[in-house]
Amino acid sequence: DINGGGATLPQALYQTSGVL
């Protein structure tokens, strides 16, 4: 939930790709 996606998946993935 680094980018506020609220996902339980690897947060580093969202932080890198900027998804959600």
Swiss-Prot record:
Signal peptide (from-to): none
Assigned GO CC terms: extracellular region
Localization: Secreted
Molecular function per GO: alkaline phosphatase activity; toxin activity
Principal location class: secreted
Tissues and organs where the protein is expressed, per its UniProt entry: Expressed by the venom gland.
Reactions this protein catalyses: a phosphate monoester + H2O = an alcohol + phosphate
Record-listed E.C. numbers: 3.1.3.1
Keywords for the protein's UniProt record, in alphabetical order: Hemorrhagic toxin, Hemostasis impairing toxin, Hydrolase, Secreted, Toxin
Role played: Has hemorrhagic activity.
Full protein name: Alkaline phosphatase
Species lineage: Eukaryota, Metazoa, Chordata, Craniata, Vertebrata
